[in-house]
Amino acid sequence: MSVKISRSVYADMFGPTTGDRVRLADTDLIIEVEKDFTTYGEEVKFGGGKVIRDGMGQSQVTNKDGAADTVITNALIVDHWGIVKADVAIKAGMISAIGKAGNPDIQPGVDIIIGPGTDVIAGEGKILTAGGFDSHIHFICPQQIEHALMSGVTTMLGGGTGPSHGTFATTCTPGPWHIGRMIQSFDAFPVNLGISGKGNAALPGALIEMVEGGACALKLHEDWGTTPAAIDNCLTVADDHDVQVMIHSDTLNESGFVEDTIKAFKGRTIHAFHTEGAGGGHAPDIIKVAGLENVLPSSTNPTRPFTRNTIDEHLDMLMVCHHLDPSIAEDLAFAESRIRKETIAAEDILHDLGALSMMSSDSQAMGRLGEVIIRTWQTADKMKKQRGSLSQDSARNDNFRVKRYIAKYTINPAIAHGVSKLIGSVETGKMADLVLWSPAFFGVKPDCIVKAGMIVAAPMGDPNASIPTPQPVHYQPMFGAYGRALTASSVVFTSQAAAAGHLARDLGIAKALYPVSNVRGGISKKSMIHNDATPNIEVDPETYEVRADGELLTCAPAEVLPMAQRYFMY
């Protein structure tokens, strides 16, 4: 017997379905469900008097014979490839299926089997995304990692050794000894981690030593001397070992101008950090590289989006992070040369055009690692308010814009750093690094963070209460963040040379090493999903005005942002 119910009642019970629209947090961004993989009348839902019970939605199939370990039911998946409603199966820590869950003995169209050995995470009315990937981390303190995780970031890549002055300023872990000690420390943290070695050297020996010692990338930073010779040598070593190179170029233009740096690239693939330039790079025109085919450009989040406070806060940040003295005129001039409202405004628009491909933090070194996701969506919202709907979107929804922006902190950094076969999207065969959000809190405060199929963090009420919801509610690590479950549910990214050797044995680590691959000639700007635009970018050296294909890129700073004080006390 069938019964008709209204869309609103259906959405309240099973979550939105095809054609329903959902607002993201308190932004103006609206998504519309493109497809529903579940079957009307055969939806599965857990709870008293609900469907997932023995002989009903739960079959007798064992896990060995194909039942899922976990099913996330009726979730609204938001990813670069689509915005769809589906059940998601997790098996052995990997996403094993996206489709319709249930009991195939009595239900039609079941491609995810629920058995006695299957747990359930209720996704009704929730949004499901891939865990975030922050590819610009200064490992200044270990407490960063918990803050990032609680924001929805499950993978972090960067450099450093702790609160040394080299780490305060540069995203580099120098030398195999430091790299080894950092990798040993990674056994304590329930996220995927990777180390970038110092790439500043004119001869290859020391760089090869770091790559073989466990670095999964090399970082060129101006504070260590990003000369054309160092750039060329670093890229040569990277080509030989299939690791990525990230660059923070020469703000002072001492060893050359942006054209000299581009020449040193020799057309080779490189990840350009804080491409706008406030975080560092040839003043005033490093932003030009965002239009090159071989450059994978990213932003750091303190300039995201351009607001009335952006300029003022940057000078103090820069002084602290780069060991500058405000009483020295040259240091002050160095700082002021990097902070330009014209290029920061253009950065907003270049993100909206898909010319800037990735978002990252620059953690504690002119960036806030707990705000990568928030600031991505604040930028998207600001651009919708100021520029209207994208041509690829309809009047009903912002689906393409949302796919463009979510790719900036999920799949694109995974592609850029050679790990997209394992992480970066909600797709079968990938590690189940997933984040559930209530739509009203999307991008701000996750409901649940899953790492390799196990809940690793969530908001949790008073542990002494009779139910899990009473105040005070805090984000807390869960069982997936402890013991051997932690090391079994996350990996360390390394070079192929390190993974093929005896590094894991020599360091005595419990986490698996995962070798990065296909980060050199096999990828380019065209590999950046929804963010592959290559406009010709020009910067006026006197006014700092930015033009893309001849069009002036400018916008007003935001006075008010969504996803801000409505959600936080401070």
Curated annotation (Swiss-Prot):
Keyword Ribonucleoprotein tagged: no
EC number: 3.5.1.5
Modified residues (N6-carboxylysine): 219
Name under which the protein is recorded: Urease subunit alpha
Lineage, top ranks: Bacteria, Pseudomonadati, Pseudomonadota, Alphaproteobacteria, Hyphomicrobiales
GO terms under biological process: urea catabolic process
Binding locations of Ni(2+) 2: 219, 248, 274
PROSITE patterns: UREASE_1, UREASE_2, UREASE_3
Pathway: Nitrogen metabolism; urea degradation; CO(2) and NH(3) from urea (urease route): step 1/1
Subunit structure: Heterotrimer of UreA (gamma), UreB (beta) and UreC (alpha) subunits. Three heterotrimers associate to form the active enzyme.
Alphabetical list of PANTHER family matching this protein: UREASE (PTHR43440:SF1)
Cofactor(s) the record lists: Ni cation
Binding residue positions for substrate: 221
Record-linked SUPFAM superfamilies: Composite domain of metallo-dependent hydrolases (SSF51338), Metallo-dependent hydrolases (SSF51556)
Binding site for Ni(2+) 1: 136, 138, 219, 362
Catalytic activity: urea + 2 H2O + H(+) = hydrogencarbonate + 2 NH4(+)
Annotated GO CC locations: cytoplasm
Xref: CDD domains: Urease_alpha
MF GO annotations: nickel cation binding; urease activity
Textual note on the cofactor: Binds 2 nickel ions per subunit.
UniProt keyword annotations, A-Z: Cytoplasm, Hydrolase, Metal-binding, Nickel
Localization, UniProt: Cytoplasm
Domain Urease per the UniProt entry, residue ranges: 131-570
Species in which this protein is naturally found: Rhodopseudomonas palustris (strain BisB5)
